[in-house]
Amino acid sequence: MPKSPTPIPAPPVKIQRGAPSRAPAKKRRRKKKRNPFLWFLQGLVRRIYFGLKTGFKFLLLVPVLVFMVAFSYNVDRSGLFQGALAPRRIVDLMLQGYDVTNFEQMDERQVVQLYAQDVPETPEAIGIGSSRVLQFNRENTGVESFFNMGVTGADVRDNMTSYYKMVTYGKAPKVLLWSLDPWVFYGSEAAFDARADADLYNEFLTKVLNVPTDYEEPNQVELWKALADPAYFQGNVDYYFKNRGQATVTDDEGNTIEFNPVEGDPYNQPTTIKRSDGSVLYDVAFRSQTEDQIRTLAAEACMSFNSVHMEGFDEMSQTQIQAFDSFIKYAQSQGTTVILVLSPWHPYLYGYLLTEPEMHKGFFQVEN
């Protein structure tokens, strides 16, 4: 068969459409295992970094907070920490060596407590008692650093807590001059003065004499929160700038505080004044009375003598005697020498009381 010059075409190749072409299989890489120690270190470093960053921001606020707290504590317009503004004014003046006016309007008990808090150096001797002890001063005691902590109408609670406050501030004196009043040994509620700090006395009984009372430690948390309160800080700022450099000082409500330095001769004042040593100097008119005028006052006092903390005082209380003895031992344990003073009453008064001794048995027991 002769060959055909035309080549025979090859059969067509079937192309399958839609069938995915397979890529050559790749080998899967194994994940490297994390070193747990390195992972821990990375987390720790991250936490430290962010912690330091936050702490640094907080540190920038610390000086501001410290200033706010210190300023509010020292100005303390509401008397939360430093005491009420009026007694603070009195104590500030006395510590600067000034005698102070307007004695009749003073809260004497607050003044005594704030003095114990603020006096920079411990006085060598202090006096406690009621009005009669208030005549002791630096001149007649011969003690330059003497301070009189007596208060008008002082009862046994006033006497003991005045000394106790000095001890709590680490200022126990070398000598305690105690002018004893008869009602110190009277075991009735009638012997108490309404102005005395009953809570402070219960604290003293509980903590020092171990006598059970209803005393509970006050919760100071809410009180101290006020120091960081922006509103209290702002109020203190306003009060400070309002009163800075002013001759007339006001209280938190804007009322004038009427306690000022005595001007002129202290022995020539028309009103009773508080001396810088805590003693009281009565006005010229009171000190200039004649003998007859004084006897008249003594006669008038006879009629109401028992009403002065001694109503029904028939005998000395054994409980009060024990409390008195415990207090003396407590003071001695603080290194304090106790000197007891029995200030005399007017002779006319003694003569009157002796006409009815059955009504004043407790009084005469103390006097004898």
Can you name each region flagged by the protein language model?
Residues 194-337:
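Secreted/periplasmic serine-hydrolase-like ester/acetyl group-modifying domain
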Residues 348-368:
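Substrate-gating cap/lid alpha-helix
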Residues 121-214:
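Membrane-embedded segments
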Residues 2-121:
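N-terminal secretory targeting modules
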